[in-house]
Amino acid sequence: MLERIKVCFTESIQTQIAAAEALPEAISRAAMTLVQSLLNGNKILCCGNGTSAANAQHFAASMINRFETERPSLPAIALNTDNVVLTAIANDRLHDEIYAKQVRALGHAGDILLAISTRGNSRDIVKAVEAAVTRDMTIVALTGYDGGELAGLLGPQDVEIRIPSHRSARIQEMHMLTVNCLCDLIDNTLFPHQDD
């Protein structure tokens, strides 16, 4: 059991090292895309399933409340938090539409969809991205594996941050770290002199 614990830590560290080499440009581009959208008075819609939903909620909470420093609230909505809306849509329109219907209702040109999917193949996330495209929104996608169907939907203005791993647990860990990096970059760009 102790050896298995060491393996988990070692794999996580190795994935972080690989990501630190492969992802800084994509993370920086995503952060600047998010910052520019916020400066233009737009909002960020976030979605994911399971652990990805938790990461989406963490991002939205860090925008609305704060990340590490006190600052004005920033407009972000986690689409996976309203159980009444989610179950109403799932019951009437099938599960695949739980985020797409919200994107069509709440999203506007210039807004961002932060779509988080470990494999990039979750039907409800893919449908949300398709809906965002029809609303002239920009997509920031956090994926893993080969990027899945989601990667094929992205245009030149969109940003994919694909974790270099084929292990779901490692991808999810790196998604959380990536969300934290994005929050840090947004805060330090918009509010460079804020104190803790």
UniProtKB/Swiss-Prot annotation:
Taxonomic superkingdom: Bacteria
Transmembrane segments: none
Molecular function as annotated in GO: carbohydrate derivative binding
Sequence ranges assigned to domain SIS in this UniProt record: 34-196
Disulphide bond pairs: none
Keyword Manganese carried by entry: no
PROSITE patterns in UniProt: SIS
A Pfam match: SIS_2
Stored InterPro entries: DiaA, GmhA/DiaA, SIS_dom, SIS_dom_sf, SIS_GmhA/DiaA_subfam
Keywords for this protein: DNA replication
GO biological process: carbohydrate derivative metabolic process; DNA replication
Family: Belongs to the SIS family. DiaA subfamily.
Subunit and interaction comment: Homotetramer; dimer of dimers.
Annotated HAMAP family: SIS_DiaA
Functional description taken from the UniProt entry: Required for the timely initiation of chromosomal replication via direct interactions with the DnaA initiator protein.
Protein name: DnaA initiator-associating protein DiaA
Gene of this entry: diaA
